[in-house]
Structure formats: C-alpha cells, structure tokens
C-alpha cells in the first residue's frame, strides 16, 4: 500500500474545507409518474409529466430512478462541511418498489477526482451479480462524468439502504433509503419509513483514514438521525409526530462508519417485526441493539401521555468512541401537545455498551427454513501491520481488473490477495456453504455477505471447534451478523446464486484495511446468467474507467472496497 494516497487525501480534505464546494443540484429522483402532477380524484387526466393528451404512439414514459453523485457543502448539524451525496441530500432520495418489481436506477458520477460504485444492500441479485455494485469484484468504478444504469429484481422485501462501495465515500453522506413493500408479520396504521442512524464528523472521513490505518481508530465527533442533528446550539433535531392510539412502523437502519447503536424511545416499548430483509415472529422490546448495516422494523403504539419524548441512538462504547455520544437524539411529539420545547423525559432503558446483536433466541424467522451443515469451512481472522486478514491474507483488489471480468474472459485464476473462495453445489455439501469464523480479542465485527441471506448456526465466545454446538432448527437468517470479540460466528447459506460475492466487515476502517473475502459461486454458471447487453455495459464501464485512470489524482491505497 502506498503513502501517496494518504497525503493526497489530506490535501483534498484541507482544500475542500478552505474552498466552498458547489451548492446542491436538485435532480429528479423518483419514478417519472411521481415527479409532476399526481393522478388523484380531481386530476385523473394527469400522469407525471404526461397526461391523457399525450400521444402514446410517439411518446412513452421512461420509468426509473435518477441518482447523481456529487460534492456539495451541506450543514447536517448546523456546521457546514464538504459532503458527498445523492441529488443534494443526506440521506439520498428514497427508492421504493413493490416485492417482485424490476428496479432501474441510473447513477451519474459528477465527482471530478474519484470514481464511485453503488451497492444495493441486502438485495439478493439472483443471477444478477453484475449489478451488485462492488468495484474490483462485480464492476469497474464509474469514472467521473460517467453513468451506469443498475437493474435488479426485488426478490426480497422490507427495509434497506443503498450506498457507495468505493473507498470510504458512504461515511461522507453517500447513502440513501431502499424500501421494498411487502407483507408484514403484525398490523400497523402508518408507515413512517426509514430512520437512519449514523456517526458524523466535521471533516471528510477520508482525512481520518491515515490515523485509522496506522493506529487506533479515530474518535468520531457526533452523529445524525435521518441526516440532521444539533451541534453547539446550531442545526435542528429530527422530529416526528404521533397521533394517540395509532400504530407506527419505523424502519431503523445503522449506516455508521464505526458506530454501534442502542435504539429506544423514552416512555415507549415496541414490537420488532423484521431483521434486515427477513420477517420474524414479532417480539416486544424497549430497545434494540443495531450493528452497522443492520435493519430492524419496529411497530410503536402511540399510547403514552400526550407530550414530547426523546428518541435515542445510544452509542455502544465498547467498540468505538464518540465525543458527543449523548447528543445523538431526535424528538417524538404527540398531536395535542402544546409545547415545542425539547423533551424533559429520561430513559428507563438499561444502557448497553456491548456492541453485540439482539439475542439470537428473539430473532425467529417467520417462515421456518432449516439449514444443512454437512461440511464446514474454517477461517481465522487476524490483524497486523495496519491490515485485517482472513487466513493470513488481506483483501487487495484491482479496480481495473474485477473478479467478474476474469469470469467473463473464461478464466478462473485470481491473485492471492483477491481472497477468492470457489464454491460449488455438490453431493457432499448438499448445496450449502458453511463458514466458521474465529476472531481475536479487540472490536466486534459486523459481518455482511452479498448475494445471500445467511443462517446463523452459532455465535459466541471462544474460537470455533468441532464440539461447538450448531443450531440447525430455523436459526436467525439475515445479511449482517456480529462476530464477537475473541469469539466465533458460524454461518450457512445455500449455493444457489452464481456470481462473485463479497463478504466483509462493515466497519468502514476494517473493510478498507482488507477485512474481506469473496466467494466465486458456481463459476461455470455465472456467464450464462449475464445477457449480451449487460456484458457490453460491463465492458464499457471498465473501458471508461481505464481511460480515466491515467489522470486519477488519488491512486488506490486501500483494499478497494
């Protein structure tokens, strides 16, 4: 790894702070028919930017979402700073679809000095690996000025997010909500949508990378709730309003760089009905532990006394620090409350500092599916020299030579540092991959697998051994689960989705330091799943990236993800 990257980024950070970036350009972000006039009881002739007067023989609406990646100065907590964002907002525009829809998102990179790529977190991408959005694995980065149209099928439903998977970009604001509508395991009256919890700084996250790589991770400054907060008397709190007696669905997501949260609402309990994209048997709670990239759907009944209540994102201090941890809050106001002042409520929740997941016994999938564990792959996580390593190898990708390109060229040999594990469905493994991860003392690690939900067979203290008990009866399944400090995590997933799939720690520093591997799944079946048009798109994106890289001011100096 080269030190030039750190010095270049530091210069970039200081320049960005010294000179204001352009203000946000407002870009349409929803489906066209939702952008202009709505088709309502009194405007039935209207259809977005079209109407009953439109000649349908010559004009057909183009549906999809349009996202623009850009540098702008924003004041999320009252302090102006350079950010990266989609369409001028943090979080970016919500992408909404129904279960079974085909989703089309056009992403344009208006950054002048960096590439980008967008990952649709938790989307299965069945037979669709080319649109998973990981540079160096499923695509080349989108070069400045370029546009890539992502296409995927909503095979699963629930709550998630989309974000940049290029270096540390999402930590500077490059993320947004992704909601796939579908059934729920409990009833409610109002869907309040996504509630984002994230850490935040007043300098670009990139400028902290040098410290994160060479020593202890930096202490982060503050945090945001749905893209807003206060700092030293400036800014504003996130607020939402309840009507007494109604039930509200809230989709909580942790999009932090290095922060684990305990979410609660003073004076309220709630039902938990989903984890990640998996509906669960509802259970009652007064708080939930939310690791990085995890999502929980909760239903809150407005049954407290009319008034104002704090919404809290409690910082989990065992894994990282935050200077203003106690200030990551929002406000719940009841209809009928005459006060607009800050709440005076206190929390009765027992504070947790563990950085662990919700108890496994609480996380019962609503649709029971039993995994198979006939053969187990073992991997050990270690650290040293500013890197994290799986079985002694730290991930290091080449953005111009993604894994999928080798597959498209009928190859099956990758550099050692690509950390490739080939997997195939066989009679011996009965179509299941089982991975036992053992880790050292130190921080917990939220492990995310692309292309699959996985079943958690065991999670606990101590390294995995042949005597470790495995749960094979409807264990929790999701796409992010925590590897405990000095402990183990045993996961299983079905070998049913040809592609190259990244597995990594979702602490951004650790991902950049190489804490990742990839599964090349059913290699001979990957190419047949990619149509000719998609192969052409893939190749054109790589050609544009290769043409731009000779002028790239910031050479790659992290793992690539």
From Swiss-Prot:
Residues 68-185, 191-337, 396-525 form the Plastocyanin-like domain. It comes from the Eukaryota. Residues 1-20 form the signal peptide. It is found in: Secreted. Its cofactor is Cu cation. Glycans are attached at residues 71, 87, 114, 226, 284, 327, 391, 398. Belongs to the multicopper oxidase family. This is Laccase-1. It comes from Botryotinia fuckeliana. The lineage of its organism: Eukaryota, Fungi, Dikarya, Ascomycota, Pezizomycotina.
